[in-house]
Structure formats: structure tokens, C-alpha cells
């Protein structure tokens, strides 16, 4: 029988451990602080930011939110980041993507103090990840790594196909999977929009991680029996519902479930782990910057 992996349950377990570490820091006079910066009028981005701030508040992390009009200059955003870099009450900084077209994304990522880069996207932190000495692992790949471990899925010696090569998920996910140690030691193939015969690659995989942002691009015919399927995608598609749309992943859940040994749903799969690992990184940042030792889960 196929196991439907409950991301909410695993995320809650991790968050509970992070909350205990937050209590330890607070008892030593250190209140972890996360600053979110939104330079967009996009409703979905506003929702994501509010979810992250609410999660922080629930475990005692102080939230600081900065809203910048999408019409403002890049310098307005850079000035805000500079202020947050210098603020000792702020241990983590998250600029919600995407930013407007007139703002260079790379410059935004490089502007954040790497010690406060809790997304793990600053070039220094990317380099540390590739070198096997990560300071902050990117939240979604780290969450998937935790999810696989909690579900009892061993990656060592397994063939893993990552579908998608984004800087946010695909590339760091592949880097984590090939590294030495628990959650790594996998033989990893990265597929993308130019991959020939994607189905041939996915059928030969023990684990498929779908992160291409294409609705239901992977179905049961592209999987072998017993595969573990991790669906990172979250896509709005038109539907005959009250809202006029429904959320689907990059995997056709119903057909894939017939083949998979374990599979994540959308929503309720990877998403809760992404937020849990943001809290994890924020508390780790507070520990590193304050010198107060903690034992994260």
C-alpha cells in the first residue's frame, strides 16, 4: 500500500525541536529575529510572507516585516537590506522572490550578509554547500532531506532523479544528495526542459524529486513500481471550483500513487518542511551570531 507522506506532521516535529532551541536562546538573553522584505504587490507572495511570519511568532522568533513598493528603485531595497545587515536584533534576512524586473536578483542575494542569509542563496553560502561545509542549507532541499530521513527512505546507493535545475531547489538538492554522509551518497541525475526522454530517466529511479514548476508533468507511466516520489511543485490550474482554480503539483498524484511506494501530496507535502527549515536556519543564525550553543533537531 502506498504511503502518503504527511509533511505537516514531520514539519510539526521539526518545529517543536526548533522551538525548544528558541527557548534556550531566549533564556540566555537572545531572541532570534527574522526580517522579511517584500517588494511586490503579488497576492501569493504576500500570503507566503504572512505564513512565514506567523510561523515565527508561534515559536518565539521575533518577526520584522518591510514592505517596499514594486515601483521603488533598486536602491530602496538595497538600503533596507543594509539597515537589516547592521541591526543586531535581526539574525536572518529573507527577501521574498521574485523581485521586480528592474531589480537585479543576483545583486539582491549578494547584498545580504552571508551570516544572515537564512535562505542559503548568497554565493558564499552556495560555495560552502558545494564544498560540503554548509552554513545554511536551502530550506526546501534541506526539508526534503529531513522528510526522506523521517520516512525511512535511505538515499545511499540509490538512483535519484531530480527534475528541475533551479538555484532554489534543483541544484542545491542535487548537491545535498551527492555528498558524503546521511541523506547523501546517492547516484544523482538532474533532468530539465532539454532532457531527452525524461520518462526513461524517471523509470530507472528509486527516488524522483519533481521540481520543474510544470503542472502534472510526471505521471504513473513514467515511474517504476516502488519509487519514492517527492513533489515540490505547487501550480494553480483552472478548475470548476469556487475559486476558479485548484492547486496541483508537478506530479499527477492519482496515477503516480498507483506505482509509488511513498509519495507527497500537494498541498501538505513539501511546503510545511520549507517553513520548518526556515525557522531552523533562523535559530541557527541566532546561535552562530550570539555564540550560544544549541542542539538543533
Swiss-Prot record:
CDD domains linked to this entry: NAD_bind_m-THF_DH_Cyclohyd (cd01080)
Pathway terms, separated by semicolons: One-carbon metabolism; tetrahydrofolate interconversion
Biological processes per GO annotation: L-histidine biosynthetic process; methionine biosynthetic process; purine nucleotide biosynthetic process; tetrahydrofolate interconversion
Keyword terms: Amino-acid biosynthesis, Histidine biosynthesis, Hydrolase, Methionine biosynthesis, Multifunctional enzyme, NADP, One-carbon metabolism, Oxidoreductase, Plasmid, Purine biosynthesis
Catalytic activity: (6R)-5,10-methylene-5,6,7,8-tetrahydrofolate + NADP(+) = (6R)-5,10-methenyltetrahydrofolate + NADPH; (6R)-5,10-methenyltetrahydrofolate + H2O = (6R)-10-formyltetrahydrofolate + H(+)
GO molecular function, one term: methenyltetrahydrofolate cyclohydrolase activity
Pfam families noted in UniProt: THF_DHG_CYH (PF00763), THF_DHG_CYH_C (PF02882)
Keyword NADP attached: yes
EC number annotated for this UniProt entry: 1.5.1.5, 3.5.4.9
Annotated binding of NADP(+), by residue: 164-166, 193, 234
Entry's Gene Ontology cellular component terms: cytosol
Subunit structure: Homodimer.
Cross-referenced HAMAP family: THF_DHG_CYH (MF_01576)
Protein family: Belongs to the tetrahydrofolate dehydrogenase/cyclohydrolase family.
Annotated function: Catalyzes the oxidation of 5,10-methylenetetrahydrofolate to 5,10-methenyltetrahydrofolate and then the hydrolysis of 5,10-methenyltetrahydrofolate to 10-formyltetrahydrofolate.
Protein name stated in the entry: Bifunctional protein FolD 2
Organism: Haloarcula marismortui (strain ATCC 43049 / DSM 3752 / JCM 8966 / VKM B-1809)
Name of the gene: folD2
Amino acid at each position: 500500500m502506498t504511503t502518503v507522506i504527511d509533511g505537516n506532521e514531520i514539519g510539526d516535529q521539526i518545529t517543536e525541536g526548533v522551538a525548544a532551541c528558541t527557548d534556550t536562546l531566549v533564556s540566555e538573553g537572545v531572541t532570534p529575529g527574522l526580517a522579511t522584505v517584500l517588494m511586490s504587490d503579488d497576492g501569493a507572495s504576500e500570503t507566503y510572507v504572512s505564513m512565514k511570519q506567523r510561523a515565527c511568532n508561534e515559536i518565539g522568533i521575533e518577526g520584522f516585516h518591510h514592505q517596499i513598493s514594486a515601483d521603488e528603485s533598486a536602491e530602496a531595497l538595497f538600503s533596507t537590506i543594509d539597515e537589516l545587515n547592521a541591526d543586531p536584533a535581526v539574525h536572518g534576512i529573507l527577501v521574498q522572490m521574485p523581485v521586480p524586473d528592474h531589480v537585479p536578483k543576483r545583486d539582491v542575494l549578494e547584498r545580504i550578509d552571508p551570516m544572515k542569509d537564512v535562505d542559503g542563496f548568497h554565493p558564499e553560502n552556495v560555495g560552502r554547500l558545494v564544498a560540503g561545509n554548509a552554513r545554511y542549507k536551502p530550506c526546501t532541499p534541506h526539508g526534503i532531506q529531513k522528510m526522506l530521513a523521517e520516512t525511512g527512505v535511505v538515499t545511499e546507493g540509490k538512483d535519484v532523479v531530480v527534475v528541475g535545475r533551479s538555484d532554489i531547489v534543483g541544484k542545491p538538492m542535487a548537491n545535498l544528495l551527492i555528498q558524503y554522509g546521511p541523506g547523501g551518497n546517492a547516484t544523482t541525475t538532474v533532468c530539465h526542459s532539454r532532457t531527452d526522454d525524461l520518462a526513461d530517466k524517471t523509470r530507472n529511479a528509486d527516488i524522483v524529486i519533481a521540481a520543474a514548476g510544470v503542472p502534472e508533468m510526471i505521471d504513473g507511466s513514467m515511474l517504476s513500481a516502488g519509487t519514492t516520489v517527492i513533489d515540490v511543485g505547487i501550480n494553480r490550474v483552472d478548475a470548476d471550483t469556487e475559486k476558479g482554480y485548484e492547486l496541483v503539483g508537478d506530479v499527477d498524484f492519482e496515477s503516480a500513487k498507483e506505482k509509488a511506494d511513498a509519495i507527497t501530496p500537494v498541498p501538505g507535502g513539501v511546503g510545511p518542511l520549507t517553513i520548518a527549515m526556515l525557522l531552523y536556519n533562523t535559530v541557527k543564525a541566532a546561535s552562530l551570531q550570539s555564540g550560544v550553543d544549541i542542539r538543533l533537531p
